[in-house]
Amino acid sequence: MFATKTVLFIAVVSLLGTFSSAAVDTFIYGGCSQEKYFPGSPYESNVNSLLTSFVSSASLYTYNNFTTNGISGDSSSVYGLYQCRGDLSSGSGDCARCVARAVSRLGSLCAMASGGALQLEGCFVKYDNTTFLGVEDKTVVVRRCGPPVGYNSDEMTRRDSVVGSLAASSGGSYRVGVSGELQGVAQCTGDLSATECQDCLMEAIGRLRTDCGGAAWGDVYLAKCYARYSARGGHSRANGYGGNRNNNDDDEIEKTLAIIVGLIAGVTLLVVFLSFMAKSCERGKGGK
């Protein structure tokens, strides 16, 4: 995932909703370096400064990268970038809200880690102690495919049309394709050149075709780009991508909350009962 010597642990992946309607702060993936920094160190100060710059800049720009230099000769320099999905704007505040959420989650996920990256539905943030800016990285981070749809010539034609439009080199760094009920989206990070972006996207799209060609939907995230396709509003990917899994999870959450509330109520009643019994005993002793 990182183009550095650090080793990353990819956090639990949970892709939810379709790209057009899912909440922009839906968690996609996150990873942190094994290497840690010391609390109170100059590097920690530079990381905090960098992440703060992300949030401030996102109210004006949908992409930016920063280098926070340390003192000459030390190892406290930190490099980072953020990027919002191509259909989000800085003017509406959607980009800034997403980046702020991503920075907050990254701070919790990668506390004291020298490097970290986090992808939400609407934005991506990354920092490291070794520069990765302008470096193409086609490492596979996430690859998920939906259930097979079986042979359907119309469906396959639409899918090929959508994926083909994503592969068009004239599409820029953010690309959208639509055919019937199918839609696709692809994007690479803003630090790549046009040639590097096309190369990265072709790798992601190629994997999407090969690995998810007969699936109802598919997602391939590489370290510096991604490509996805899905039926518009036709499925939910919560916790394993099953169409009804989200409702089941909500039911489980409600059941858990009901149990917790019941336990709290039971404990409260027990405390009241014991208090009443204790007072009754005291009155009984006082009357003797």
UniProtKB/Swiss-Prot annotation:
Its membrane topology: Single-pass type I membrane protein
Family under the similarity heading: Belongs to the cysteine-rich repeat secretory protein family. Plasmodesmata-located proteins (PDLD) subfamily.
Subcellular location: Cell membrane; Cell junction, Plasmodesma
Extracellular side: 23-256
InterPro entries with a match to the protein in the record: Cell2Cell_Antifungal (IPR051378), GNK2 (IPR002902), GNK2_sf (IPR038408)
Top-level lineage group: Eukaryota
Species this protein is from: Arabidopsis thaliana
Sequence ranges assigned to domain Gnk2-homologous in this UniProt record: 25-132, 137-234
Gene behind the chain: PDLP6
Keywords for this protein: Cell junction, Cell membrane, Disulfide bond, Host-virus interaction, Membrane, Repeat, Signal, Transmembrane, Transmembrane helix, Transport
Job description of the protein: Modulates cell-to-cell trafficking.
Signal peptide: 1-22
Gene3D superfamilies (alphabetical): Gnk2 domain, C-X8-C-X2-C motif
Quaternary structure (record): (Microbial infection) Interacts with Grapevine fanleaf virus (GFLV) 2B-MP.
Residue ranges crossing the lipid bilayer per the database entry: 257-277
Signal listed as a keyword: yes
Repeat listed as a keyword: yes
Tissue specificity of this protein: Highly expressed in inflorescence silique (at mRNA level).
Cytoplasmic side: 278-288
GO annotations of cellular component type: plasma membrane; plasmodesma
Name of the protein described by the UniProt record: Plasmodesmata-located protein 6
Cystine bridges: 32-110, 84-95, 98-123, 145-212, 188-197, 200-225
Main location: membrane
Region (Necessary and sufficient for plasmodesmal targeting) residue spans: 257-277
